[in-house]
A protein has these predicted regions:
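N-terminal Rossmann-like dinucleotide-binding module
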Residues: 1-52
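Active-site loop of classical SDR/Rossmann-like NAD(P)-dependent oxidoreductases
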Residues: 40-43, 289-300, 315
Length: 333
């Protein structure tokens, strides 16, 4: 009888709301053992420990790295992502990080270089890829059923803004709504088009209704970005915080081909419920509807790769740098 392989032992660095959500999803998947919780906030650590009572609770990355773990999930403020991920990778741990991987393409490249050098698995929580709606859209695009897909429109308007002060400090966050929300949209667009070269990037970025210039030090609350891809195909991205959207959020993505189109949109302003449709001329076929418990799937996919692949480097991590480079270009840096 074949001996059962032990589950990967992982730690969590940062256990705020999103960290605890991903922790719960990984526990429920039974793909890994949560062996350590690290958070400087005792309340967050205590709440996380209730989900994983067998995990050791520590207060620093240093302490976590001493435990001989296989991997770490990083869910800390953005300013720490690059340095924390690099330290973990150099210590031999695989890494799953909240987006953004870095505040710039330079930081993202540093992390990817470290993952490659250490031969460790690197993932980033671009979670919208794993909604049922987006998965079914991607299948249609990849199948060729839509013909040549030549244009895409992607939108994420949030009627609220982040509740943490660091989001509004460009040095700490790397940017405003474009970094926070637009990164998801740029990731989706490049993924759907299979990571082509980007010929040009133009943008209009605002704060409080005033156009921002590069290097202003302010973070934006509204951004529109246009991409022209190597084959001339066009992508438009728009995102915002605190916009008068008439609902909690407007989240939509549409892809148009020579033989049809696909789109997904949120339902009644929800941040979590989506429908997707397949367009043929003036007809629309619904291909995905709620409910769909998708929030932790990206993390579970990463931990499954960790378990089955031994945590080795996946070259798809190189694509994370392209997402960051597009954001850099949109910011004019």
């Amino acid at each position: 009888m074949k001996k059962k392989q032990p589950l990967p032992r992982i730690g969590f660095l940062g256990t705020g709301w999103i960290g605890r959500h991903r922790l719960k999803a990984i526990l429920e998947s039974r793909e890994a053992e949560v062996a350590c919780i690290a958070d400087v906030c005792r309340e967050n650590a205590s709440d996380a420990a209730k989900l994983a009572p067998g995990a050791l609770v520590v207060d620093s990355l240093d302490a976590l790295l001493e435990l001989g773990l296989d991997a770490v999930v990083i869910a800390t403020p953005s300013a720490g992502h690059c340095s924390q991920a690099v330290r973990a990778l150099e210590a031999g741990l695989s890494v799953f990080c909240q987006k953004p991987l870095g505040r710039s393409a330079y930081e993202a490249q540093m992390v990817v270089n470290s993952a490659r050098a250490a031969n460790r698995l690197l993932g980033v929580d671009f979670s919208y890829r794993f909604t049922d709606a987006v998965q079914k859209m991607h299948q249609l695009v990849s199948s060729g059923e839509l013909g040549e897909v030549y244009a895409a429109d992607l939108v994420f308007h949030n009627a609220y803004g982040p509740d943490k002060a660091w989001f509004y400090d460009a040095e700490l966050s790397g940017g405003g709504c474009l970094m926070d929300l637009g990164s998801h949209l740029v990731d989706l667009a490049l993924w759907f088009f299979d990571y082509p070269q980007v010929r040009s990037v133009s943008s209009s970025i605002f704060s409080g209704g005033q156009r921002l210039k590069g290097g202003s030090g302010k973070v934006e609350d509204y951004a529109v970005v246009s991409l022209v891809l190597e084959n001339g195909h066009a992508v438009r991205v728009a995102c915002s915080w605190n916009v008068s959207a008439g609902r909690d959020a407007v989240i939509e993505s549409s892809f148009y081909g020579t033989q049809g189109g696909v789109a997904f949109r949120n339902v009644q302003g929800s941040f979590y419920d989506f429908v997707a449709e397949h367009f043929r001329g003036t007809s629309a076929e619904t291909i995905a509807t709620p409910p769909d418990d998708w929030g932790g799937r990206c993390a579970v996919d990463w931990v499954r790769q960790l378990r089955t692949g031994g945590g080795s480097y996946n070259p798809q991590a190189e694509n994370l740098v392209q997402v960051a480079a597009v954001l850099d270009a949109a910011y004019g840096r």
